[in-house]
Regions:
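Core segments of cupin and vicinal oxygen chelate
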Residues: 12-55, 99, 107-119, 162-208, ...
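Short amphipathic beta-strand starts and helix->beta connectors
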Residues: 62-66, 142-146, 212-217
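Short amphipathic alpha-helices in soluble, non-transmembrane regions
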Residues: 25, 61-62, 94-97, 175, ...
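Vicinal oxygen chelate
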Residues: 5-14, 35, 66-165, 183-211, 250-324, ...
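Conserved donor-binding loop and adjoining core beta-sheet/short helix segment
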Residues: 33-38, 48-82
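Surface-exposed interaction/gating patches
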Residues: 151-254, 270
């Protein structure tokens, strides 16, 4: 019963068309599922990932057109990263970001890896991290039809940063699900405590969480450009049910078992209020669509299929068809 690393991140957008264009045409990720938020079917839920949307490669977005801008603060997932294969790939991305007008930093080193910090069009704080020296959870396989050459393509999710007021509480929750402390690095803001690097299972960039203590910030307000939750990988339904018992014994309120069709989940908030999810690796995104046309049409799980007509009527048009 082991957490294996990061499964996916789910963030917020107010512009589903602009989001689709940036993540597919600029970052070169594959849209592997166009579906809806199962808790609010008036909103799209887009999944981007590697060629097949393997667990550990998925960056997802809920679309809420009227949502305000995210306000940075504590109790937030304040930084998300995407893995690329090599230091050479970072050089390619600097040129690509310049070409496409993406706000970005020079290549630098952070927590033992070379990295480029950048923002998406709605201000989400992202980075590209090089897997040049990575040891641990392996990455995925870039889609061969991406506009980005496969040798430079994004291969998965890298370390995430949690910004909190009481780091010991978040660290305790991470330890409960199997994380251990790897290292501490100096704070990015003068006068703040060191950032604690936590890892799980095989470790490496696909299994790392960075806990940033900040005593100088107000609580976050979630909006476009913000991250809603992080999910961690587990093997199957049996393990998920066992984790529900662990959380119950620890006195952590949780959702219990949730059927998401493409995977199974449970949700809980760690003591600083950040939403965590445990999600199974399967069944996967090719359960209801052929591999060749993943993400090209609106996919609905069987328990929403009888509502398709009304759901489609309430969604904004979004053309994601590639095989024309």
């Amino acid at each position: 019963m082991n957490v294996k690393g990061i499964h996916h991140l789910s963030a917020m957008t107010g512009s589903v068309t602009g989001n689709f264009e940036f993540y597919t045409e600029v970052l070169g990720m594959r849209l592997i599922k166009k579906t809806v938020n199962q808790d609010d079917t008036s909103a799209y839920h887009l999944f981007y990932g590697d060629e097949r949307g393997n667990a550990g490669t998925e960056l997802t977005f809920f679309d809420f057109p009227s949502i305000g801008q995210n306000r940075k603060g504590v109790s937030s997932i304040s930084g998300s990263s995407l893995r690329v294969p090599s230091d050479e790939a970072l050089g390619f991305w600097v040129e690509r970001f310049i070409e496409h007008g993406v706000k970005h930093s020079p290549i630098s080193e952070f927590a033992g890896r070379n990295v480029i910090f950048f923002e998406d069009p709605e201000g989400q704080q992202l980075s590209l991290v090089s897997d040049e020296t990575n040891v641990g959870v392996v990455g995925g396989t870039p889609w061969e039809k991406s506009p980005v050459p496969t040798q430079y393509g994004i291969v998965g999710l890298g370390p995430i940063k949690l910004t909190v007021r009481k780091p010991e509480s978040t660290i305790a929750a991470l330890r409960l699900i199997g994380f251990t402390e790897k290292a501490r690095v100096p704070a990015l803001v003068e006068g703040q405590e060191d950032i604690i690097i936590m890892q799980v299972a095989e470790g490496g960039s696909g299994a790392e969480v960075q806990v940033e203590p900040r005593s100088d910030l107000s609580p976050t307000r979630l909006g476009k450009g913000g991250v809603h939750h992080v999910a961690f990988r587990i093997a199957d339904k049996e393990e998920l049910l066992a984790w529900i018992e662990v959380l119950n014994k620890a006195g952590l309120p949780n959702s219990g078992f949730v059927e998401r069709f493409y995977f199974r989940s449970l949700y809980f908030r760690e003591p600083n209020g950040i939403l965590f999810e445990l999600a199974t690796d399967g069944p996967g995104f090719d359960t209801d669509e052929p591999f060749e046309t993943l993400g090209e049409s609106l996919a609905l799980p069987p328990f929403l299929e009888d509502q398709r007509e009304s759901i489609e009527a309430n969604l904004r048009p979004l053309d994601t068809k590639r095989s024309k």
